[in-house]
Curated annotation (Swiss-Prot):
Similarity remark: Belongs to the PurH family.
Keywords: Hydrolase, Multifunctional enzyme, Purine biosynthesis, Transferase
Gene this chain is encoded by: purH
Protein name: Bifunctional purine biosynthesis protein PurH
Reactions catalysed according to its record: (6R)-10-formyltetrahydrofolate + 5-amino-1-(5-phospho-beta-D-ribosyl)imidazole-4-carboxamide = 5-formamido-1-(5-phospho-D-ribosyl)imidazole-4-carboxamide + (6S)-5,6,7,8-tetrahydrofolate; IMP + H2O = 5-formamido-1-(5-phospho-D-ribosyl)imidazole-4-carboxamide
Domain notes: The IMP cyclohydrolase activity resides in the N-terminal region.
EC number(s) reported in the record: 2.1.2.3, 3.5.4.10
């Protein structure tokens, strides 16, 4: 009995060569629309699906393969009962289904209007794929050109057939998830209300050597059609990115961009293990980098750096004496790239990608599920800061408090930041008590704490932090407020002659 293959693909990579090989092996080929035109144009004998169904394509191609002559041939078990039913209807079996789907994701990604996006929701393709995958014992299902060579073997094992079926269902599942995400994104309920059902449409974009540690496999995935500054960054110099490099670069860039939106000048953020360790703003990138580096030279070693303005040759040279893992910037001049490649060949130098379609959701894995929330993207201008002490902050202290607030918001809780003149002088992050975070920040600052301001991402349960800060020379404090002992903390500030500002906005980060 002659074997039959149905080929209908949007991605035509390798399809002519594959079809030619099948035809040479005696297969009868069926096809539709553009694929039929491609194959027949290449001189390959092929029948139109409409010749098999006896029914023309209709509704501008929306209905082509949704017919018993097609799905009966795919779904029939190769046993007497099913084959007899096919014979009674003069339907032949279909032994191979090679289908990939309308380019829905790509259509969304290029910003096509809604009617065009909707028209690129494939109906017949997923139906054929799912039918073939269900009957994979008898039907080979191919959704990836990488599997064409396998299908040309004399025998395909049951295990390989099952693998191809699983791959096919994954293909349609991801496709449906992309459609769901698109349609849900148009809902008036988002982003102010989390949906009852949330699909994570993830596509692997990079394979890394391992995850956080060598014994953990790891990879980088794209969520839907989103584009990000780090996952879509251009690596212009240095080694391939690691799992930890991606995580730290994303944290550094996020904080850098938040500060750049509220500060005048160039911003530099140095990060270690997703926590800021040196942050500064200055007139140019070179100066901002030098100030951020000098804020904590010990912790910056082996860190990841993000800057808000292009890196030129002079800025590149100023990084010569410090070992860094990653530098990410909006641009890097060609002479700076050449210098990095020659003088710091291990440094990964990234030109940030342009964010597009980024979800407002922050998704954290739990055992058996996910914790989902809206991202903490509240800007300073949304706050209503209130001075709650007798002493008012000076103009410079206000500027430093605003700067410190953004920095501490980007650190892991419990977190305290000391800042002065647009640079961090002491940081304490990831502490299990607030006083320990303050002690670490103040110890890190040393004499630079004199005249600095202090910001905390959450309230003070006691007056111990403000007393410690005042003893180190801190002159102004910022915190959300809202603790039971707020009156005691305010009284301590008045007693010590320092200012305190309540923001009314907590910023835990776990």
């Amino acid at each position: 009995m002659t074997k039959r293959a149905l080929i209908s693909v949007s991605d035509k990579t390798g399809v002519v060569e594959f079809a030619a090989q099948l035809q040479q092996r005696g297969w009868e080929l069926l096809s539709t629309g553009g694929t039929f035109a491609t194959l027949s144009g290449a001189g390959i004998p092929v029948r139109q699906v409409s010749d098999v169904t006896g029914f023309p394509e209709m509704l501008d191609g929306r209905v082509k393969t949704l017919h018993p002559a097609i799905h009966g041939g795919i779904l029939a078990r190769r046993e007497a009962g099913h084959l007899g039913q096919l014979a009674a209807q003069d339907i032949g079996t279909i032994d191979l289904v090679c289908v990939n789907l309308y380019p829905f994701r790509e259509t969304v990604a290029r910003g096509a209007p809604d009617p065009e996006v909707i028209e690129n929701i494939d109906i017949g393709g997923p139906a054929m794929i799912r039918s073939a995958a269900k009957n994979h014992d008898a039907v080979l299902v191919l959704v990836d050109p990488a599997d064409y060579a396998l299908a040309l073997q004399d025998e395909v094992s049951p295990a390989e057939r099952r693998r191809l079926a699983a791959k096919a269902y994954r293909h349609t599942s991801e496709y449906d998830a992309a459609i769901t995400a698109y349609l849900s994104g148009e809902s008036d309920e988002l982003p102010t209300q989390l949906p009852e059902h949330l699909s994570l449409d993830l596509t692997r974009t990079a394979q890394v050597r391992y995850g956080e540690n060598p014994h953990q496999p790891g990879a980088i995935y794209r969520w839907g059609n989103a584009r990000g500054p780090v996952i879509d960054a251009q690596v212009v110099a240095g080694k391939p990115m690691s799992f930890n490099n991606y995580a730290d670069a994303d944290a550094a860039w996020s904080l850098c961009q938040e500060l750049a939106a509220q500060e005048q000048g160039a911003v530099c953020v140095a990060v270690k293990h997703a926590n800021p360790c040196g942050v500064a703003v200055a007139a140019d990138v070179k100066t901002a980098w030098e100030r951020a580096r000098d804020a904590d030279t010990l912790s910056v070693f082996g860190g990841v750096v993000a800057v808000s303005q292009p890196v030129d040759f002079g800025a590149a040279q100023s990084m010569k004496g410090t070992f860094l893992e990653v530098l990410i910037a909006p641009d890097v001049t060609p002479d700076a790239v050449e210098w990095f490649a020659a003088k710091k060949p291990d440094l990964r130098v990234l030109i940030a990608g342009q964010p597009q379609g980024v979800s407002v959701l922050d998704v954290r894995p739990l055992t058996g599920g996910f914790a989902v929330q809206e991202r903490d993207a509240r800007p300073w201008d949304d706050l209503c800061p209130e001075v709650v002490t007798e002493r008012q902050p000076s103009e410079q202290e206000w500027a430093d408090l605003r700067f410190a607030w953004a920095v501490v918001k980007g650190a892991r809780s419990n977190a305290v930041a000391l800042c002065k003149g647009g640079v961090t002088v002491g940081l304490g992050a990831g502490a299990v008590s607030r006083i320990w975070a303050a002690e670490r920040a103040i110890a890190n600052a040393g004499e630079a704490a004199q005249g600095a301001v202090l910001a905390s991402e959450a309230f003070f349960p006691f007056d111990d932090v403000v007393r410690l800060a005042a003893s180190a020379g801190v002159t102004a404090v910022l915190q959300p407020g809202g603790a039971k002992r707020d009156p005691e903390v305010i009284a301590a500030c008045n007693e010590l002659g320092i200012s305190m500002v309540f923001t009314g906005s907590r910023h835990f980060r776990h």
